[in-house]
Every structure is written in structure tokens, then in C-alpha cells.
């Protein structure tokens, strides 16, 4: 499990990359994570602009304008990856468990922006 300073580094890095960016599409591959993802999750995020990425304890919070938000907890083995849309290279691996090739079956959520996407990957 990442410690608090590691989560803060992920927050800072994520904030630099996605602040003021608009979500084009959300892909949910697994709704049954620690907390079941709500049915309206995609609708709440798609076509919304990120205002900032904040943190409460070890929870990452992607804040959107007009009050919507997305809460992420990395758990024991979760990672966040920023991947260019052509999938040929990673912009940033916001993980301390570097894995260049993500097993697709563990890519639970993708948040797609204009030229890149965020992938939440967790083998647990």
C-alpha cells in the first residue's frame, strides 16, 4: 500500500496533467471494486472539466466544475497510468510499482481525455 507521501506525489503529478482538461469518455470494465461503481458514474464525468485533484488522507479526489467528483483509493496494489492515445508510450506512470505492460484484465477504469487517458489498474 502506498504511504501518504507517495499518494501526495501521485496527486501532484495527476493534478499537473489533468487540471483544466475535459473528460471525453469513461470506460468501466469492472463495476465491482471495493465499492460498487454507481450506474450514473459515466454520465457524471463525461464532458466535464477537471478543476483540480485533491487528497483526503490516502484518497485521491478528482474534482470537476459544478460539484461532481471522483474518489480513488489505490488500495494495496492499485496504480494509475497516463497513457498517450496511440498507446505507444506512457506519459507518466503514477505508480511506485512500475509495470510497462499493464495486464488489460486488471484495467478496471479508463478516463479518456483529448490526447491521453488515465487507467486505473489493480490486480486485486
Residue ranges and their predicted role:
Residues 1-124:
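Structured catalytic/nucleic-acid-binding cores of DNA maintenance enzymes
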